[in-house]
Amino acid sequence: MNVDLIFPNWPAPPRVHAMIATQRGAGPSIDRASFRETLALPSEPCWLRQVHGTRVVAFDRQAGDERATATRDFLPPLAGEGARRADGGNTATKADEPDADASITRIPGIVLAIQTADCLPVLFCADDASEIAAAHGGWRGLSAGVMENTLAAMRAPRENIMAWLGPAIAAQSYEVGDEVRDAFLSHDPAAASAFTATRPGHWLCDLYALARQRLHAAGITHIFGGGLDTFTDSRLHSYRRDGAHSGRMVSLVWILPASI
């Protein structure tokens, strides 16, 4: 399994570890069987069946159990969720993977995972390493409130939470229709600043700017990352560039146990 790694440039506490893994030469299906061993992860990643929604799940683990399980559910999914796969994907999922687009945990050793190939992965952590979260920011989920729902599920005060914006398609590569712009402007007219007109009914959409805007409005001031372009960077997977043959990047975050 050949993997390239990107490490977030953020001032996370030493006990919080995070990375973006890109499997070279891979198609839509990630080699999960060797994923943990290759990356020396403390446990199997907690995969989600991402559906471009706003549902958040919490992962917990009973003492002695190897596999983390989703034990709590924060906020119901959007009406009609579950029919649409994230990033147009065909990535294989298991029946016990929850339909959700964000997850949180406060348990050291549990690895949260988000898969993307143009959409925006966002990682969160409390500055005391007490909890972490990971969210999938496709335009549907982002406009509908997946970031706000993720923050609502976290216990840490907003001023003690930091966010890192992972690799996503950049504005110059992401032309969208009126329906995308309208979805954001219906929530906040200020979102208009993240769209640049190209031709009638079409706009360049800045996912990074939209995420920062929503996070700032939710009380998050410590925001990092957000400068890559999956479409033009050959290291990164892009569904818009490569279509159904595109691979997936995996954003991972976990808490190390406290020193004894």
Residue ranges of predicted features:
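Active-site microenvironment for binding and transforming phosphate-containing groups
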Residues: M1-A79, R84-I260
